[in-house]
Amino acid sequence: MAVYNYDVVVIGTGPAGEGAAMNAVKAGRKVAVVDDRPQVGGNCTHLGTIPSKALRHSVRQIMQYNNNPLFRQIGEPRWFSFADVLKSAEQVIAKQVSSRTGYYARNRIDTFFGTASFCDEHTIEVVHLNGMVETLVAKQFVIATGSRPYRPADVDFTHPRIYDSDTILSLGHTPRRLIIYGAGVIGCEYASIFSGLGVLVDLIDNRDQLLSFLDDEISDSLSYHLRNNNVLIRHNEEYERVEGLDNGVILHLKSGKKIKADAFLWSNGRTGNTDKLGLENIGLKANGRGQIQVDEHYRTEVSNIYAAGDVIGWPSLASAAYDQGRSAAGSITENDSWRFVDDVPTGIYTIPEISSVGKTERELTQAKVPYEVGKAFFKGMARAQIAVEKAGMLKILFHRETLEILGVHCFGYQASEIVHIGQAIMNQKGEANTLKYFINTTFNYPTMAEAYRVAAYDGLNRLF
């Protein structure tokens, strides 16, 4: 059995693992990474963020073509199968794997492909697909194994028409009707994707509002646009059982309703990938959702073992995971790169997309903060009119006395890009965080960024 010695070993090569490995090696540490796939990238690259966003982009292009009057001069609306649009995602995945493999090679980071489990707090065994076992010894470890869809025991995921958010990427046909159980971020994103392909979607939500962590106005806008695209949203519903048939699936709800569709997508919760790590050998225990508890330095209860990304829970975003991994390595190397990651913008890739940072109106009202609102509707923006993307708005929440920006919420074309301008100003200290920045700054024209100036004027006009 081969034995290798390192300063830092990172388990997982998703965003958190990559961030940790790169920061540790830049600090002069000898680093290795382990992944249970035969390629780097983690769930983010192979099953999550990258394929779903590539799918969304392809579907959005189809929708633009079908909805643009200019193209009606060429021919009738065109429809593509799910398998067709998935091909573009596969190409993006291959490019991402190639790029990330190069990152590890250029930085002289050793890569091991196999299942890692702890023998003790300084040793792991890596079991490769061919059965070969290697031992890695390290001073510190970073657990960045990510998460997977939660699967309740009473749902038969071996049935060929029942999927979760990982296996849906193996769907070989386009269903006429699809049931999505779970209206969180992933459920709403896939509802947008499939409805854009002409699929009738039933979106089952066990709450009374979609994505209730969002600003209420943004959540309402999402509900409207999903319904406008033939998504039937059913709130306050819970499943009783899922019945798989030869030609479809019947969802039995506790309310007594029955819904039949060609396929069923379970999208209700995720669990951390900790069950194969041998945590019991080092005195660690994951919670009921498979997540590992860490302190503000991303250190677990075992002093030389850290964790980052989805495996520690909130916020379960690729962007935050990378920074968490980088910060965990910063804690290990003490190279001043540590920070607790809590100022995280939300990006939701529905159609139209959503992004936000800071406080919502509900939160500010509950805290009795004297705020005001400035809005810019995209239908009045020249760039949105040119792009035929008139749905959406930018909303700025600011303190009515100091003009400090308290929250930015965006729904529509390029929302996930637009939000970062507001985030940058919000992160300025003291009087530099002010609504007046957008009044006193010249924006390119026509741009979507110009919405900040329009929203700022709108907000100032509400003051007296």
UniProtKB/Swiss-Prot annotation:
Cofactor(s) this protein requires: FAD
Disulfide bonds: none
Annotated localization: Cytoplasm
Top-level division of the source organism's lineage: Bacteria
Enzyme type, top EC level: oxidoreductase
EC number: 1.6.1.1
Signal peptide start and end residues: none
Catalytic activity as recorded in UniProt: NAD(+) + NADPH = NADH + NADP(+)
Example GO molecular function: dihydrolipoyl dehydrogenase (NADH) activity
Gene Ontology cellular component annotations, sorted alphabetically: cytosol
Cofactor note: Binds 1 FAD per subunit.
Keyword annotations of the record: Cytoplasm, FAD, Flavoprotein, NAD, NADP, Oxidoreductase
Amino acids binding FAD: D35, D36, R37, P38, Q39, V40, G41, G42, N43, C44
InterPro entries per UniProt: Class-I_Pyr_Nuc-Dis_Oxidored, FAD/NAD-bd_sf, FAD/NAD-binding_dom, FAD/NAD-linked_Rdtase_dimer_sf, Pyr_nuc-diS_OxRdtase, Pyr_nucl-diS_OxRdtase_dimer, STH_gammaproteobact
GO biological process: 2-oxoglutarate metabolic process; NADP metabolic process
Pfam families found in the cross-reference section: Pyr_redox_2, Pyr_redox_dim
Entry similarity comment: Belongs to the class-I pyridine nucleotide-disulfide oxidoreductase family.
Its job: Conversion of NADPH, generated by peripheral catabolic pathways, to NADH, which can enter the respiratory chain for energy generation.
Complex and partners: Homooctamer. Forms a polymeric filamentous structure in purified form.
Full protein name: Soluble pyridine nucleotide transhydrogenase
Protein species of origin: Azotobacter vinelandii
